[in-house]
Amino acid sequence: MTLKEFIIPAIDIKGGKVVRLYKGEFDKVKVYNENPIDMAKYFEDAGAEHIHVVDLDGALEGLPKNIKILESIVRSVNIPIEFGGGLRSFEAVKAVLDLGVERVVIGSLAYQNPEEFYKIVESFPNKVIVGIDAKDGKVAIKGWTEKTEVSPLEFAKKYDDLDIFGFLFTDVSRDGSMIGANVEATVELAKNLKHPVIASGGVGSLEDVIKLYEKREFGIFGVVVGKAIYEGKIDLKEI
């Protein structure tokens, strides 16, 4: 896997626009682009192998809210899209996969309704990424607004034997901060799981990406990068 393949550029959508939150706080929003579809095309042209799309409105409301935009993104590019945000029912997941999304990220539902989650994984093998959002070493749900008492590893172990694609581990306290990814926690998680782990949160430079890339033998599949690209700290075309 090349370094470029390891990077999964992110498009976070709120109110129909491309935004980034700071540390998962919905009142700390910065708009980077008015058009998510243009952004997706840019990433494809820059050589991205896949794109990570998040419906922030959906994450907050518990139901995908930017479906039309998602559909347009899927139609506009020829690279796989992974999507998360508000996928809290079988119907919502099916609708998104029917649009042509490659993989779905599910977090809150896996925690709150394991039965429904098992049904989804059974129906869509290898299509589900379990989203693990961590705040102060514990899993956070409902768009990061609610903290549980469960550790990321404890949470992940419940699903590691299922036919999932892997896990997405986000350190919410670093998300949008560009202070560097939590390499240690990501490696610790990946080492103890059978399925691959995608890292997310805090990447501020190509050096941060390389630190994770060098640990890929432990089961790290890639890293989601958002703000560092939008702020010009990482240029996909140059990699």
UniProtKB/Swiss-Prot annotation:
Keyword check for Zinc: no
Pfam entry (one): His_biosynth
GO cellular component term, pick one: cytoplasm
Annotated pathway: Amino-acid biosynthesis; L-histidine biosynthesis; L-histidine from 5-phospho-alpha-D-ribose 1-diphosphate: step 4/9
Catalytic residues, chain numbering: 12, 133
Single GO MF descriptor: 1-(5-phosphoribosyl)-5-[(5-phosphoribosylamino)methylideneamino]imidazole-4-carboxamide isomerase activity
GO process terms (BP): L-histidine biosynthetic process; L-tryptophan biosynthetic process
CDD domains per record: HisA
Subcellular location: Cytoplasm
Keywords from the named record: Amino-acid biosynthesis, Cytoplasm, Histidine biosynthesis, Isomerase
Main location: cytoplasm
Gene3D superfamilies registered for this protein in UniProt: Aldolase class I (3.20.20.70)
EC number(s) stated in the UniProt entry for this protein: 5.3.1.16
Catalytic activity, reaction form: 1-(5-phospho-beta-D-ribosyl)-5-[(5-phospho-beta-D-ribosylamino)methylideneamino]imidazole-4-carboxamide = 5-[(5-phospho-1-deoxy-D-ribulos-1-ylimino)methylamino]-1-(5-phospho-beta-D-ribosyl)imidazole-4-carboxamide
Stated family: Belongs to the HisA/HisF family.
Stated name of the protein: 1-(5-phosphoribosyl)-5-[(5-phosphoribosylamino)methylideneamino] imidazole-4-carboxamide isomerase
Gene: hisA
